[in-house]
C-alpha cells in the first residue's frame, strides 16, 4: 500500500492539545502518515506555557536529515520554531531536499498568551522561511506583525494578505478567527482573493486550532488536492473537531481530533 507522507516541524506540547501531538492526530484523521521533527520541548497545559527547552541546531539538522534520507514527505508543515538559528537550519535543509508543499504556521504566541518565538526571530522567519513556503497561515495578530499593518476589518485583511504574499512570494491564508466577527478566512494566491466562509462555533476550548488547521491543509496537499480544496477540507475537519465540544483542563482546552473516528477499537469497556 502506497501511503501519503507528511512531516511536522514543530514544538512538543506535553498536554497533547497543540504542537506535534495535535499535528500527528490531525494527520492520522486526514488519512496520511505523519512524521515529526521537534524544535523544542514545552512544559505547558491548557492554562499556559511554563517552560521551553529548545533543541540545538545540530540535533535539529540530524532529525531533518534522518527523515528526508529515508521517507520523503509529500508535504511539510512548520509550526513553532522559537529561534532564528533553528529557522536557518530548517530553511537550509528544506531547500537542499527540495521539499514540496511547505505550509508555514508562523506561531508566535500560545492560545493562553505565552510567547513562543523570540522577538529577533521574526526577521529570520520572513527572510528565510516565508520565501520557501507554499502557504503561510497567520492569524490576525501574526498577520499584523508580518505586514506591519493594523487589521480591524475585512478590507484590512485584504491589504495585509496582499502585502505579505507580494513581499515574500507565497500564498497567504489569513485566518479571521481573531478579532473579526466571524470565522471567514481569506486566501491570497497567484494574485487572486478567495474568501472561505466559516460558521463561528461557540466553544471556548480552542487550544491547538492553528496547528490543527495547518496540518490538515498539508495533509490534503499531500493527497493531491488543490490549495483551495485542501483549505476547504481542512476547515470542515476543524469545524467538526470544535463542534464535538471536548472539555478537558482548567483553561482553553483542546479540540476532539478524533471526533469522526469509528470502529470497534475505539469503544470503551
Predicted regions and their residues:
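Short pre-catalytic strand/loop immediately N-terminal to key active-site residues, enriched for Gly-Thr
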Residues: 9-15, 193-207
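N-terminal basic/disordered segments at the start of proteins
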Residues: 16-32
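Nucleotide and nucleotide-moiety/phosphate-recognizing core
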Residues: 88-97, 170, 192, 228
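Conserved N-terminal subdomain of the carbohydrate kinase-like
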Residues: 2-8, 28-104, 108-111
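Short, small-residue alpha-helix embedded
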Residues: 21, 144-145, 203-227
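Charged C-terminal helix
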Residues: 54, 228-269
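Phosphate-handling active-site elements
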Residues: 31-35, 194, 220-234
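Conserved phosphate/ATP/ADP-binding segment of small-molecule kinases
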Residues: 119-193
